[in-house]
């Protein structure tokens, strides 16, 4: 459907969160005292209601920016609204998009060949930096210029702000490593651009260096929304005002709250689509309005938005299980993949929408793939169902090794209790291996978090966030490695 939101980011260094994550605190659930103190300090320099600056650019606006005791700054309904009512609407022409960046006077002269070689996310990042440096260039940029000023005055918090020592507090989790990889990729990309003279002129004229480029991508990580369009393309948008809404895990995950809509007036060209926020439920006047940034784990929220949610129901751990791709088992893998959330990934360097489970062939430069990676975003609420879909892959690989010349392997070949038990044991061993990379017990982390929360020191905010991530991930892994002799997976029927 036109305008369906993409709920996860590309698996590349240049596109990190795909849902808007506004500042400074973003969860409907109350945050720790230390985190709220730090957030209050970061927002002290902002205007009382930064939304007012954009009033003339909104098609409709029925919210106002307000401070809330439980969450910090958020968006309050100006009047009572019903579920589905419009809260905010802004034309795309006033938003940050790759199309707007290509029309930027500093970037347009580079020509289509060069601009086509720059990713949409990088185009938006460069546009933000250019406008931040020089202000508006014509009426089309005035709204974006105001937004760039606000972005420059706002502390952008992501895991890229954490020091190497602070990231070590996440040891065991992939989120301890991802920020360094991302920063390295961004800096390398910027360095490569510095060998292209026309871009160097743009950089020098607008004081753009590697640090600024990383900052702009942090803005995208925390504020960008992506929409899957009917033609198969993806539209990335940073919408002034839309990025001021807070996240709620109680808001429904879907495409009805933040969406692309045609203009309400027939006199307005259809090309001027609107970025719209609609109420996911009824709100009273003055009540904070939220939408869901998607079913993101605390690790992903911390990476892209600098916050976590205590007891986040969407917490997950990402498994990457490599299996040999023997000729006899290839059709069986493909058949089993149909039961996965995302099926079989075919071609391309990344998935535009990253499902919770999918099978991906490992590229082989010298010929056909010889291995596959089974990606599983293991969530606490669905552990049993997900592992039940994974065990048959291990069983299939066992059968293929035992009979490499077999040509009749099918789902009907699976389900023998003894084979299923061994396959479950192998899966549990993989999970245990991942669990062993985490230091300490779940109980020790819970006790440490409780002690830090009691102290309420702002200086411990990041330590508390790290513990929330580790607690969520350890709880999932500890649940997934119950003894095989009592594990229902070992005795599952075919």
Task: Put a short name on every predicted segment.
Residues 2-8:
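Extreme N-terminal basic, low-complexity initiation segments
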Residues 32-94, 98-105, 133-494:
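Long, positively charged leader/targeting segments at protein N-termini
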Residues 114, 127-128:
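E2/UBC-UEV (E2-variant) core
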């Amino acid at each position: 459907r036109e305008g369906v939101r993409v709920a996860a980011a590309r698996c590349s260094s240049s596109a990190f969160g795909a849902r808007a994550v506004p500042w400074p605190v973003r969860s409907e659930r109350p945050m720790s005292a230390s985190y709220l103190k730090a957030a209050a300090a970061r927002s002290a320099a902002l205007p009382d209601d930064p939304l007012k600056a954009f009033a003339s650019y909104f098609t409709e606006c029925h919210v106002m920016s307000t401070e809330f005791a439980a969450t910090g700054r958020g968006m309050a309904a100006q009047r009572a609204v019903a579920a589905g009512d419009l809260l905010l609407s802004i034309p795309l022409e006033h938003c940050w998009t790759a199309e707007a960046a290509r029309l930027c006077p500093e970037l347009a002269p580079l020509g289509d060949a060069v601009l086509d070689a720059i990713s949409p996310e990088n185009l938006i990042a460069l546009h933000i930096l250019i406008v931040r440096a020089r202000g508006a260039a014509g009426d089309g940029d005035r709204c974006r210029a105001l937004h760039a000023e606000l972005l420059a005055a706002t502390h952008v918090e992501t895991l890229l702000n954490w020091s190497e020592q602070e990231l070590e507090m996440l040891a065991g989790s992939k989120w301890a490593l991802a920020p360094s990889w991302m920063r390295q990729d961004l800096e390398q990309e910027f360095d490569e651009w510095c060998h292209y003279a026309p871009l160097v002129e743009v950089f020098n004229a607008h004081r753009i260096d590697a640090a600024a480029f990383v900052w702009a991508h942090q803005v995208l990580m925390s504020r960008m929304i992506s929409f899957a369009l009917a033609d198969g393309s993806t539209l990335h948008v940073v919408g002034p005002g839309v990025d001021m809404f807070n996240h709620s895990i109680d808001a429904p995950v879907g495409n009805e709250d933040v969406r692309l809509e045609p203009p309400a007036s027939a006199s307005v060209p259809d090309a001027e689509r609107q970025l719209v926020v609609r109420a996911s439920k009824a709100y009273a006047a003055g009540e904070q309005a939220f939408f869901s940034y998607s079913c993101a784990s605390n690790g992903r929220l911390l990476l892209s938005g600098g916050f976590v949610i205590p007891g986040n129901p969407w917490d997950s751990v990402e498994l990457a299980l490599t299996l040999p791709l023997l000729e006899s088992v290839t059709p069986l893998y493909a058949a089993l993949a149909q039961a996965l959330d995302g099926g079989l990934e075919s071609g391309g360097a990344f998935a535009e929408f990253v499902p919770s489970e999918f099978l991906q062939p490992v590229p082989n430069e010298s010929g056909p793939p010889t291995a596959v990676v089974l990606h599983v975003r293991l969530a606490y609420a669905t552990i049993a169902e997900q592992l039940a879909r994974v065990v048959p892959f291990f069983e299939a690989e066992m059968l293929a090794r035992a009979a490499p010349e077999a040509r009749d392997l099918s789902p009907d070949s699976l389900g023998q209790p003894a084979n299923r038990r061994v396959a479950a044991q192998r899966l549990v061993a993989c999970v245990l291996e991942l669990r062993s990379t985490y230091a300490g017990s779940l109980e020790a982390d819970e006790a440490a978090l409780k002690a830090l929360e009691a102290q309420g020191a702002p200086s411990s905010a990041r330590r508390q966030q790290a513990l929330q991530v580790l607690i969520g991930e350890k709880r999932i892994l500890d649940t997934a490695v119950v003894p095989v002799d009592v594990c229902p997976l070992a005795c599952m029927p075919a």
